[in-house]
Amino acid sequence: MTTANRILVLFCLALSATLAVNAQDDPRWAVVPNINDLDDWNVQPNSPALAKAIGDAAEYVLRWKAPGSAEDWRVRRPQVERGLRKSLGLETLPPRTPLNVRSVASDDRGDYIVDNLIFDSRPGFPVTANLYRPKTRTAGRLPAILSPIGHLIDDGKRDTEVQARSIKLARMGFIVLSYDAIGHGERMTSGNTHHEGGYALLPLGETITGWMVWDSMRGIDYLLSRPDVDPSRIGITGNSGGGLNALYTAAVDDRISVVVIVGYTFEFNNWIKYGGAHGTCSYLPGLFREMEWFEVAGLIAPRPVLMLNGERDSIFPVSGARRASNSTKALYSVLGHGDLARFYAVPEQGHAYSRPYREQMYGWMAKHLLHEGDGGPIDEGSVETLAEDDPRLLCDPDERLMLAAPSVVELARRAGNTASDDLSAAPAAKSRDALRAFIQDLTAPPEPEPHNLMPIRVERSEREGEPEKVYFLSEIGQHIPGLLWVPPAGTPTARTIIVVDEEGKGAVAESDLVEPLRRAGNAVLAIDPRGRGETLGHMGNRTNNYHLISISMMAGRPLAGRRGFDLTRAVDFVARRDDLPLDNLTVLGRGDDALPALLAAVADPRIKRIVADRFVSSFVSQMIPAHLPTRQQLHREWNQSLMRRGKVSGADYTIDLASVIPSMLRYGDVPEIVSLLADRKVLFANPKDGKTRNGSPYPRRLERLTSSQDLTVTQEPLSADQLKEWLAR
């Protein structure tokens, strides 16, 4: 080949490669040009922090394997049960207080009767329910079925699919109790939605899911109080959130003898990666660290369980349902009961409890509770339901009862106040040691040996006052970007101040704090801990905040604690730099990121001064209802806004749910955390709960500490001058 030919061939190859690259990047051929336009159900997001959290959680849950023998399960089962009860917040069951059952209406429908009932699952906490029962009485007692409702926000138990299955079951000879879930149907009132109520309960060590399960357990109590119900024949079935309720209730209450789970069968490992974001009830603290889904279902064994999932279900993908059901069936087989666990992927069906699902359920219930048939589908026949807005199914038509009843948030605040008071009265040494250990666990490194920081200077400007752009690795896969400002040339660096802000380092850069602090001789390092600023990312019209919070919590790594760890690594970064003094190191946390600053200071004695700006003075103040005057706004907030932002906006202030730590109030409130820093200087400025409309008692508890430690509490907004004056003390 001549030299000219070689040159021509190389040119053609280069041109082909260029055209291929251009074709690959050409937006004309892109189906979804922007990944942010995709829905978040089945797509891993473009968030470094969330990708890291998902990867870690999925890796951790892989350790849970199906038992190889009945003996293996005998050993493993108590561990799973303890872990599940702990995650649900049902380690100790609430007292079984009087149900106070009220029958408010009865509707004779010919061959069946519908009673409208209200019972109290807790004192003053009403549950609205419909009881479907056969009109013709037979000799002996009848089997009963609990029918918990999923996320049917407006219609609840009046949904036509709920009515249809209840009517058919009553005609088959069952007594059926359908009841509104907390925050749904007639119980959808301010302070009861799963996001508001769920996050209000977490600091107490309780969950909205545990409360839903307790509603179901009290529903069983009611059924067993009826002379026409056979206590040995109790079934439960529900879809989506109702399937969740059926699964967990059956797992912890062996009075249930038959289970049908619809639209809630999934493998945790699969769902973590591809399941997207869901309601708060799906996220149980630390569950991924305790078990896989099939092990929860294994707690039901050897009772019969039917798992139904639509082939077109986009919320709980059928691939994960098949994996989970295969593992569940394998566990049942190991125990010698392989025929009592069945899975069916319903063709052409999405996420619902439509007729094809119901007919499968009828056959399963008939076989195991009526001792009829082989468990195959039973035709539903003709079923006439009421319109979903028909008032005949309402228990509280004028809403007087529900509006007068305390909400989950109100009840959580009452319990929170009691817990906080008890903490302040607890023996100091014992409670302080327990709190310190709890915080050390929250902020603990993921591995015994720290990962290499790999600090990198991305960009350094020669212009006066411009920040240096840096980043380092907090742990493998978790990069922390930062902006570093140094004092003017010729001015010695007096101290280093690390700043975190709930709005990210960009908010610090645009604040009026940096320049005065820099000119006063301070180096200022503003970082984005995981899930802040550029590490957060978006998916569609949502930030990834809520999804990141939820995955981190289920993995047993609450985000505030992980951000506290990131701050201790920022201290490591400062220690690596010869130009940044470590003496008198100060950490400033703004908004809800004041909590990671406090946690980091408890964990790391190298932090000598701590500033908490615009945080709450008590974790009870995190328990707030969304400020939404109308039911329509409440519906929209439940289903959209909270999941888009991961925040609750109350009448006086907003809470970022990332600052909510499960079981926190079992160990300490904000004043107790501050008291652990008695050997350091602390400035607590402008607490967001200090100027509420109705006043707040919590800042006063914090102020009482000023007599025993170097603590400054001010209700005024933090200014650069105030901060400089405090730093000079």
PLM feature spans:
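Bacterial N-terminal signal peptides that target proteins for export
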Residues: 1-9
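Gly/Ser-rich "nucleophile elbow"/oxyanion-hole loop immediately N-terminal to the catalytic nucleophile
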Residues: 136-140, 194-239, 256, 541-591
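Short beta-strand element of the alpha/beta-hydrolase
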Residues: 129-131, 139-150, 493-502
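Bacterial N-terminal signal peptides
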Residues: 8-18
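Short amphipathic alpha-helix adjacent to the substrate-entry channel of hydrolases
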Residues: 159-177, 509-526
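Glycine-rich "HGGG/HGxG" loop immediately N-terminal to the catalytic nucleophile
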Residues: 183-195, 270, 531-546
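Alpha/beta-hydrolase-fold serine-hydrolase catalytic core, especially in secreted/extracellular enzymes
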Residues: 24-127, 137, 301-303, 308-481, ...
